[in-house]
């Protein structure tokens, strides 16, 4: 997202490469990231699926970028196939793949795997705020509800999703998890989706007979409002 002024040049260079080598995975992954940066979900998904069909091995840098792109598009099942061997060998995976692995567990709502990652001696950093979030949800016996709510959010946002981020805050004395969903720039349904999610999350909690946790919130924005894009466009 960081260099909007250079996107056109990047696209032209990538297309020249792909004209010569139509199945060049690295070029296609760069093109995929560009489509996501531009908020062009349909073309991004098509490119992600093209890469999937070609298959083959990738350097860690490009595999990580591809997995992150799949997560930004809400293609969790595809990402899970690539991450499964990483979860089976944390010692080798975490030094490089930790950010996308953690993002995957948060999107999927897996308290179990969030804890497995953050408590691993191979984790590259301490996650004190996330430890607190996990502990609270365990004490509340809220793990399964968290997973169901995350699935509900993804199911309702996926058709327009072009970015999935999160922030952790502890300014209230405990950890809040804020999910940030970036929608395809062609959609103008951000506020509508936000309202739909609030209604459906409340309905789920009511039907499950649980109080809604006030430590999880959702923000919906246009892909054009991604902070890196906004910063770059002002420069």
For each of these PLM feature ranges, what is it?
Residues 149-153, 189-212:
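Short, non-transmembrane amphipathic alpha-helical segments
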